[in-house]
């Protein structure tokens, strides 16, 4: 299996609250990388990051189908798996591409466990693409940082949960967009994420940055990214640079 774990895939803009399809992001060669791994006339399944939000899922499915076509990625089937049709997960062996959508990390994590996706991917040899929450849930141990009001101050909120085990890297997406974010009266980065990084490295990706995982488990990070470890932020790469190879 190959995997492309992105902060964002792009593929849409919002106009008056409506999703308008566009080509996928081309920053740091993201679209070229997807094309190089893409099988012509693929069968594709998106697994929702908001499994009970059906209107949103229908909108994402419709938009991404057109976006992939605009991006020169051909397919014969394009499915959205959410709470309405969990049974289609049995078709994973037929799929050439599985996409893990963005959404709420803990909600998607529960859904992935219901689907037994980790077990289903053990002997699957297709292309896995993920963005945002989907990328975060690919970790062996997922950093599910607080994101909704109340989560940062909830003593029962679990910030570390088991994931799909595709990588040991903990991804923090949309970094540049969240630098000024305030949650429950605290700075999301400095007060919350830095504290959670004690003893745990978190890799922060800007939109347009991504990690490519090859069949031999080597991981290459493309684009601007940062290491957050023990409360310290270290820049580890720049746009248009392939800068880090890890063997996990």
Q: What are the roles of these predicted feature ranges?
A:
Residues 101, 122-141:
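Catalytic nucleophile loop
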Residues 91, 114-126:
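Catalytic-core regions built around general acid/base machinery
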Residues 60-63, 112-117, 186-188:
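Charged helix-capping and loop-helix junction motifs
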Residues 1-40, 144, 148-248:
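C-terminal and late-domain segments of enzyme folds
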Residues 1-97, 248:
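N-terminal beta1-alpha1 cap of cysteine-dependent amidohydrolase-like domains
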């Amino acid at each position: 299996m190959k995997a492309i774990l992105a902060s964002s895939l792009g593929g849409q803009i919002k106009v008056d609250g409506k999703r308008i399809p566009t080509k996928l992001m081309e920053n740091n060669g993201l679209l070229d990388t997807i094309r190089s791994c893409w099988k012509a006339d693929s069968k594709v399944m998106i697994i929702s990051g908001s499994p009970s939000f059906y209107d949103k899922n229908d909108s994402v499915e419709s938009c991404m189908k057109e976006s992939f076509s605009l991006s020169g990625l051909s397919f014969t089937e394009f499915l959205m798996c959410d709470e309405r049709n969990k049974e289609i997960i049995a078709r994973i062996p037929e799929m050439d591409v599985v996409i893990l959508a963005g959404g709420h990390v803990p909600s998607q994590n529960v859904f992935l466990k219901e689907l037994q996706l980790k077990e289903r991917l053990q002997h699957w040899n297709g292309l896995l693409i993920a963005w945002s929450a989907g990328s975060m849930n690919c970790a062996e141990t997922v950093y599910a940082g607080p994101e909704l009001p109340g989560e940062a101050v909830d003593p029962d909120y679990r910030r570390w949960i088991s994931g799909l085990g595709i990588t040991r890297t903990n991804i923090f997406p949309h970094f540049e967009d969240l630098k000024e974010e305030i949650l429950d009266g605290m700075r999301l980065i400095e007060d919350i994420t830095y504290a959670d990084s004690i003893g745990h490295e978190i890799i922060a990706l800007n939109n347009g940055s991504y990690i490519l995982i090859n069949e031999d488990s080597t991981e290459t990070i493309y684009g601007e990214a940062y290491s957050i470890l023990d409360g310290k932020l270290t820049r580890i790469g720049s746009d248009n640079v392939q800068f880090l190879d890890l063997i996990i």
